[in-house]
UniProtKB/Swiss-Prot annotation:
Residues in coiled coil: none
Example GO molecular function: fimbrial usher porin activity
Source taxon at top rank: Bacteria
GO BP term, example: pilus assembly
Protein name: Fimbrial usher domain-containing protein YdeT
Organism: Escherichia coli O157:H7
Span of the signal peptide: none
InterPro entries linked to this entry: Fimb_usher, FimD_plug_dom, PapC-like_C, PapC-like_C_sf
GO cellular component: cell outer membrane
Length: 382
């Protein structure tokens, strides 16, 4: 039994009947054989071969596909040569295709320590021939830009000529940006006399107890990063994601029921911000929004030498300031490293329980240039 699926008319009297599908139950699938072989050739690349045959009832004809190829690297330059053959019972002609591709990274011509914006870009070329006179050539460049590699671009042009194919030129260009507050994309394509422009935006929003946070498109399970005061800090191993102006960020995908490591990049912290810890581990359940909280100390960073009387404050003394009760421990020669200090204030120093084992430091930080990461000063404890 055979027949067609007919598209219903819309009411236009000039519309012709459209046959959108064909079926033939007389030629039902009977059996299939497949073989696939691949082999690494050490530093010389790899080769592969695959073949398949689909047989049908009530006919001796069958669908046949054969392909084999060779991939050969020349350092960081990659090349491939492939051949494919196909024949099916619905077509009288057999299809052949011979294809060659070449990919050259821009870094091939750069030093290993190059900071060029195009160090992650590539040039590509491909040629295919149907062995009937038809040939297609494509060439282009693609890669990533920006320090976080979150701007992907691709430009390609090509032409087709000869054989039974229609001759002409074609091309396209695309830009895809992945940002902390969402993704955007724009593209242009042209083929023959027709052209197309497209663009789009996507993202996600989480409403939580501390407000609203924007991010990239959300998955089923995700992580909300909370680091108040640590704004515009990069999230390690996440493309284009950093904390917003309040110190919040969304990690749109997380592994459920497993430890997820969330790390802030300490190198992207502002000069007056220090984190108690830069790595937090969360274990979300399915569909949950896990929160990774980081405690940021905002203020001056000081390496202070404390004097008590004519001597240094004893080794092991605890120094606290304001509401920070965690304290810092005094090292040798009365030196202590303090973070999150306001421009002026008081420090409480303690190394025992009696009144002679406690003192207070009145300090005032000097005005320093923005590039100064650490103040050093000596203070008297009274």
């Amino acid at each position: 039994m055979s027949g067609y699926t007919v598209k219903p008319p819309t009411g236009d009297s000039n519309e012709q009947t459209q046959f959108i599908d064909y079926f033939n139950l007389f030629y039902s699938k009977r059996g299939q054989e497949q073989i696939s072989i691949s082999q690494q050739l050490g530093n010389y690349g790899a080769t592969f071969f695959s073949a398949s045959r689909q047989s049908y009832w009530n006919t001796s004809r069958s669908d046949q596909q054969i392909s084999f190829g060779l991939n050969v690297p020349f350092g960081d330059i990659t090349t491939s040569l492939n051949y494919s053959y196909s024949n099916n019972i619905w077509q009288n002609d057999r299809d052949h295709l011979l294809a060659f591709t070449l990919n050259v990274p821009f870094s091939h011509w750069m030093r290993t320590d190059s900071q060029s914006a195009f160090r992650n870009s590539n040039a590509s070329y491909s040629m295919s021939n149907d062995l009937k006179g038809g040939m297609t050539n494509l060439s282009g460049v693609y890669g990533t830009l920006l320090p976080d590699n979150n701007l992907n671009y691709s430009v390609q042009v090509g032409n087709t000529h000869g054989g039974n194919t229609s001759s002409g030129t074609s091309g396209y260009s695309t830009l895809n940006y992945r940002g902390a507050y969402g993704n955007t994309n724009v593209g242009y394509s042209r083929s023959g006399d027709s052209s197309q422009i497209y663009y789009g935006m996507s993202g996600g929003i989480i409403a939580h107890a501390d407000g609203i946070t924007f991010g990239q498109p959300l998955g089923d399970t995700m992580v909300l990063v909370k680091a108040p005061g640590a704004d515009n800090v990069k999230i390690e191993n996440q493309t284009g994601i950093h904390t917003d102006w309040r110190g919040y960020a969304i990690l749109p995908f997380a592994t459920e029921y497993r430890e997820n490591r969330v790390a802030l990049n300490a190198n992207s912290l502002a000069d007056n911000v220090e984190l108690d810890e830069t790595v937090v581990t969360v274990i979300p359940t399915h569909g949950a929004i896990a929160r990774a909280t980081f405690n940021a100390q905002i203020g001056g960073k000081v390496l202070m030498t404390l004097k008590y009387g004519n001597k240094s404050v004893p080794f092991g003394a605890i120094v606290t300031h304001g509401e920070n009760k965690n304290g810092s421990i005094v090292a040798e020669n009365g030196q202590v490293y303090l973070t999150g200090l306001p421009q002026s204030g008081k420090l409480q120093v303690s190394w025992g329980n009696d009144k002679n084992s406690n003192c207070i430091v009145d300090y005032k930080l000097p005005e320093v240039s923005p590039g100064t990461l650490l103040n050093q000063q000596t203070a008297i404890c009274r």
